[in-house]
Curated annotation (Swiss-Prot):
It comes from Mus musculus. This is Uncharacterized protein C19orf44 homolog. Transmembrane segments: none annotated. The keyword Lyase does not apply. Keywords: Phosphoprotein. Residues 355-368 have a biased composition (Basic and acidic residues). Residues 132-162, 222-234, 278-289 have a biased composition (Polar residues). Pfam families: DUF4614. It comes from the Eukaryota.
Length: 641
């Protein structure tokens, strides 16, 4: 399955809008080749076989193989059965779907609105297939008629075979894709809710496979033509292959690159494409669901589908052609919904006094150029042109500011996005500038002190506000004469200026202004010297030393040291008194501590005498006599002595 090829450069993705407009002779050759290749289609094989072969040729075919000065024809493999089978199957199934839709309309229905639906479908379908019905001008389209006839004859049988391409369930209106609903604006208004979106998706898939197969056959047929200048790169440019996930991303990228290089020619190309897509959409659906096999029809329909995707991406904004025909008021009103952030420096905001006329001229030019740019969406290519505006292309409004009551006027530029300037924003901005520029608040403290200064400042502020409001409103009305919205209307505001004037700081000690004078003079008065000095013009050195050697700080420090010394003395005296009282309390105590000598002396003095034998016998006798007498008392008879 591998093919030999030599790439001349990196493959390019997407297509260029300028490459779609080929010569009429090339288109005739491509049409003849397509008719010849479609006439040799042999049905009977499965269209799923060898799918990766077409994908390899689709993504690996370099666009730069056919250069400007080279007539090299590369060796390509012959057309396979799978490409022919896919073309035949695509045509046959597309015709089957259309015939099933036509047969479904012929079923008798009870409601009148269903009959009106069927009549509207019958009116819309011949318009869609009108390009395929003109077979007298293009004789190679007879093959399509034959395929349609065979498909009709096959579908006239039992209806069970044809129901496999029609979905049983109908998607609700909200569940359909929004992009398809917007793209088919004219048919969405018609009551064709019976047709499901799945049929249209199947038709789109079949058309895409048909375009892939035709591209492969045209690339294979190129080497058989001896003098053909049509190469595979041109064919890649002609056949637009929208992917199902992102239908308009490639086209938008190419439009952005081309608009960066040359914005003016792309504008003409865009206008031409828009007129072409308008003709295609008037002939039928914008999605271009048709069964005509020639390359010119595929090219036109696919181009219209691409432009339909671009329309979907840029909705609900208008393009340059339509927006240039609208009045200035509608463009300004629509631009209120298109917010932009303009970050300008101080140099952009400052305008010289002599450039006022030039600024007005540039303002009118910017208004003319901004009409076509502001109406486009951020995803459209004109967004890049809007970002490349010159810095001086802004609305420059002059605001008069009166300063110091001398009639000196200055101009301040109010820079805002085009179409979004409101009188309230400009008025509030210039009011703040007028209040900050007025020096009455800062200079009236010492010059004016009283109610007269307040009245003069209020009058000056009111005059400034009146002059500014008159000039600012006239500029805004001249800039936006036909504004349809009430958001930017001028609002009258009364600003009152209030000021607080304070007195001198009330300190306890007032320093004399003549404190720096060393000599005794009349400034010191009679507080320090004799009122009638003997020699007032002669000052002795002792007097100067006495006046300058001591300062109030030194005197205060001396007094503080004296007080600290007296406090220290009092603390020492109190400590002595406490110690003396403690000693007195200890000396007057009656308790006496005994020493060892005193204890021995006491024992010696109080020791008893030693006991002798006689004393011991005497004590024994005394002890024996006493108990015996006590025991015999009253029991024994008295003894006779």
């Amino acid at each position: 399955m591998a093919s030999t090829r030599r790439p001349f450069g990196p493959p390019r993705s997407g297509f260029d809008l300028r490459d779609m407009f080929l010569d009429s002779s090339r288109m005739e050759e491509i049409r003849n080749l397509q008719a010849r290749s479609l006439g040799q289609v042999t049905p009977g094989q499965s269209r799923i076989l060898k799918r990766n072969q077409t994908m390899d040729e689709k993504y690996l075919m370099p666009k730069e193989e056919a250069m400007a000065g080279r007539g090299v024809s590369l060796g390509l493999r012959p057309p396979t059965i799978s490409s022919k089978t896919r073309a035949s199957e695509a045509l046959r199934k597309l015709a089957q779907i259309e015939t099933k839709i036509l047969n479904r309309k012929q079923v008798p229905m009870a409601w009148s609105d269903v009959e009106s639906d069927s009549t509207s479908i019958e009116q819309s379908l011949p318009k869609r297939t009108g390009a395929a019905s003109v077979s007298s001008q293009y004789p190679h389209r007879t093959f399509q008629k034959q395929v349609n006839k065979t498909c009709v004859s096959k579908s006239d049988g039992p209806s069970g075979n044809g129901s496999r391409f029609l979905k049983k369930k109908e998607l609700p209106t909200e569940a359909r894709s929004p992009g398809l609903a917007v793209g088919t604006g004219k048919q969405a208004l018609l009551p064709t809710k019976k047709e499901s979106a799945s049929d249209e998706e199947e038709e789109m898939l079949l058309l895409r496979s048909l375009m892939e197969s035709s591209r492969e056959k045209e690339a294979n047929r190129n080497q058989e033509l001896p003098g053909s200048s049509v190469s595979r790169s041109n064919l890649g440019k002609v056949f637009l292959d929208p992917t199902p996930d992102q239908p308009g991303v490639l086209s938008l990228l190419s439009v952005d690159q081309s608009s960066l290089k040359s914005p003016r020619p792309i504008q003409s190309t865009r206008v031409g494409l828009r007129t072409h897509s308008r003709q295609a959409s008037s002939a039928g659906d914008t999605v271009s669901i048709t069964a005509s096999p020639p390359i010119l029809d595929d090219f036109s329909k696919s181009a219209s589908s691409k432009m339909g995707c671009i329309k979907l991406a840029s909705s609900p904004s208008r393009t340059e052609l339509e927006s240039s025909e609208e009045p200035v008021s509608e463009a300004a009103a629509d631009s209120l919904h298109d917010f932009r952030i303009n970050i300008l420096s101080i140099d952009d905001l400052v305008l010289a006094d002599g450039d006022k006329s030039d600024g007005d001229q540039r303002e009118e030019d910017c208004v003319r150029e901004g009409i076509s740019v502001r109406s486009s969406s951020p995803t459209s290519p004109t967004r890049l042109e809007a970002q490349m505006w010159p810095k001086n292309c802004v609305f420059q409004g002059t605001a008069t500011v009166v300063g110091d009551g001398e009639g000196l006027t200055t101009e301040s530029d109010v820079s805002e996005p085009p179409g979004t300037s409101s009188s309230a924003a400009v008025q509030s901005h210039s009011m703040s500038r007028a209040l900050t520029a007025s020096p009455a608040y800062s200079e009236d403290f010492e010059q004016f002190s009283g109610p007269l200064a307040l009245e003069e400042s209020l009058d000056r502020t009111l005059d400034t506000l009146s002059k500014f409001s008159s000039s600012g409103q006239t500029d805004i009305v001249a800039r936006q004469p036909l504004s349809r919205t009430e958001w930017g209307r001028g609002v009258t505001r009364v600003v009152k200026e209030t000021a607080v004037q304070t007195l001198d700081p009330a300190f306890a000690y007032q320093w004399s202004k003549a404190g720096g004078i060393a000599a005794v003079g009349p400034a010191l008065g009679g507080a320090y010297v004799d009122p009638a000095p003997i020699a007032s013009h002669i000052v002795s050195a002792d007097a100067i030393e006495a006046l300058t050697a001591y300062s109030p700080a030194v005197l205060a420090l001396n007094d503080m040291l004296k007080q600290q010394l007296s406090l220290t003395q009092q603390f020492i005296e109190a400590s002595h008194q406490l110690h003396g009282s403690l000693l007195q309390s200890l000396d007057g105590d009656s308790f006496h501590y005994h020493t060892l000598e005193e204890a021995k002396e006491y024992i010696r003095c109080h020791r008893p005498a030693p006991l002798t034998m006689e004393a011991a016998l005497q004590e024994v006798r005394e002890e024996l006599q006493v108990p015996a007498s006590e025991a015999c008392l009253g029991t024994c008879p008295p003894r006779n002595q």
